Amino acid sequence: MRPFALSAAVFAATALSQNKGEKTKCADGLYMIAVRGTGEDKGSGRIGEIAEDVSKRVNGSIVSPLDYPATLQDPDYFDSEEAGVKALSAALDGYHSSCPNGKIAVFGYSQGGQVATDVFCGGSDNKPLTMSLVKDSVVAVIAFGDPSHVANLTYDRGTSKNDGIFERPSNETKLCEDNYSDIIRSYCDTGDVYCDVGKNNETHGSYFEKYGKEVVDFVVERYEKALKDESTSTQTSTAAATATAETSGSATASDAPSATTAAPGNAAAGLVPGLVLAMIPLALAVSEYL
């Protein structure tokens, strides 16, 4: 990966300054970031249509297009992709800070797929997101036709057996395989010019129709699982806290002295009058023989 060039840095700074001061709206459902592919018009692109399909099944969801160049030239691909990485990292950090209980899904196509995987796995001179943020908030990461695709990973889907034109190094794939294989799905089919180094130009645009429904089902399933796990965790924590409080209360009660129990000194003193009374009949009986 090339060093971050001035043009991309300026773009990223401009995008961030535009968003600075804007109040983030927290989604009642999923907050989905769509990262369009190279050459697509500004907006969420074709990958955004998949996100919109998810929103139809998850009420209260928001689809947010990532603002980045998505260009091949001016700025060139590498600068554009790095600007996307910076912008996506900032968007995820910002949403998590504003909506700590919110759930996020990321969708990336082509160059956008590389942007997404760079953010989570590391790449483009970028440190990956903190693991705690991902575990807390991110339920799914979808990539279609990622040029940095590496074949035969646990989160790969599709028919490709080859690495992409910008093959990702093993240390980055290991990070994602070890920690995020349950939330990432990277689709690449045989023949794709960019993710499979193939010769079929049509393959690169075929994922939407071919895998769209599968992706929607996966994202919805991951979202529902996250909510269920969160609910179970909350119930377990509440039950544990209640049990601790009850145990503490019982221990306090058992440790307190009984109101009906006399102090040792008083009990001994109470025996003296009783003994004296018991001795009177005996003394009278003895006196008769004297």
Model segments located where?
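Classical eukaryotic N-terminal signal peptides for Sec-dependent ER targeting/secretion
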Residues: 1-9, 271-274
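N-terminal signal peptide
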Residues: 10-28, 285-290
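Active-site catalytic motif of lipid deacylating hydrolases and related acyltransferases
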Residues: 22-101, 185-212, 216, 221, ...
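Gly/Ala-rich beta-loop-alpha elbow adjacent to hydrolase catalytic centers
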Residues: 108-112, 116
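Active-site nucleophile loop of the alpha/beta-hydrolase fold
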Residues: 138-149
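C-terminal low-complexity, Ser/Thr- and acidic/Pro-rich disordered "stalk" regions positioned immediately N-terminal
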Residues: 225-265
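Cleavable C-terminal sorting propeptides in eukaryotic secreted/cell-surface proteins
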Residues: 264-290
